Regions:
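Conserved ABC transporter NBD signature motif
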Residues: 59-70, 74-75
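Conserved ABC ATPase "signature" region
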Residues: 99, 103, 110-128
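ABC transporter nucleotide-binding domain
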Residues: 175-265
């Protein structure tokens, strides 16, 4: 089966900074794939190259088996793009924005009104038909941006941080909308800083570091790459003593912001962990199953920009 999106060996440099360093990824038709990684790892650059807003220094992007470089402007009509920064015209009403982009993307004139009406209803925008787009809340602007990105029924939907600037309630609403798109078979590539978002929406997650994919798979597959079956979180008066004792026991140790997490090589109960760390001035211990966050920290090693 031909991949909906095939990316091979992308390189991109800005001045002295090598942003992409052999980035490769495949997205299957009907799949939702999330890109996770720290700030500056190249996520948005990848999306901009896919959408032909940037040109790679080397490498190839294929859409449904056809090289993007050979399709020129036509390729853009096969992709729906929802950028981080709103591309809406603030003085237009929602239906006018949809109408404008329908014309821009080449939707036949005879179909435009029906497309606008369908998207206004699908994204519950009808109550805001008399509100200028720039006056909508962040969540409703993002809904409208999703509608605009789908106006030409693209083969691939690209979402750059789709819920980055909205409140929790709006984020839940947007997740529900994206889940509906996923369940209807829409092929989606998205970037996110929210691990819960990736876990909820994505069939697969690709973890990025230094401009390339360092691990990819379903959430269970990524978790299986963590060398431990449980995570012990420790509060201690003497972190160094805990770390030293854990190393002696052969446990993997991770420390961030003054907190210690231990990846156990086998399942232990709290009493056994406490006994093993006896004398290390431990105040509190908790044991949790390995999560996507643990996989991210183990495989990428940076949690400064995730939540």
């Amino acid at each position: 089966m031909t991949a909906a999106l095939q990316i091979d060996g992308l390189f991109k440099r800005f001045g002295e900074q090598q942003v992409l360093n052999g980035f490769s990824l495949q997205v299957t038709r009907g799949e939702v794939v999330g890109l996770l990684g720290p700030n500056g790892c190249g996520k948005s650059t990848v999306l901009n190259i896919i959408c032909q807003l940037l040109q790679a220094d080397a490498g190839q992007v294929q859409l449904a088996g056809q090289p993007m470089i050979e399709q020129s402007a036509h390729a853009r009509t096969r992709i729906g793009y929802c950028p981080q920064q709103s591309a809406l015209y603030p003085d237009l009403f929602p239906q006018e924005n949809i109408q404008f982009f329908a014309r821009l993307y080449g939707v036949p004139a005879a179909q435009r009104n029906a497309v606008v009406a369908e998207l206004m209803e699908r994204f519950s925008l009808a109550p805001y038909a008399a509100t200028r787009s720039g006056l909508l809340s962040g969540g409703w602007q993002q809904r409208l941006s999703l509608a605009v990105a789908l106006v030409h029924r693209p083969e691939l939907l690209v979402l750059d941080e789709p819920t980055v600037a909205v409140d929790v309630e709006a984020r839940m609403d947007l997740w529900h909308l994206i889940e509906g798109l996923r369940d209807s078979g829409t092929t989606i590539l998205l970037t996110s800083h929210h691990l819960a978002e990736a876990q909820r929406l994505c069939n697969r997650v690709a973890l990025m570091r230094n401009g390339k994919v360092v691990a990819e798979g379903s959430v269970p597959e990524l978790i299986s790459q963590v060398p431990g079956q449980a995570v012990v979180k420790v509060q201690s008066e003497d972190n160094q003593a805990v770390i030293q004792r854990a190393i002696e026991l052969g446990w993997s140790v991770r420390q961030h912001a003054g907190k210690i997490s231990l990846l156990l090589p086998h399942n232990l109960n709290l009493r056994e962990v406490g006994d093993a760390l006896d004398g290390s001035k431990v105040n509190a211990i908790s044991i949790d199953p390995v999560t996507l966050e643990d996989a991210y920290l183990e495989l990428v090693g940076d949690n400064s920009s995730i939540s």
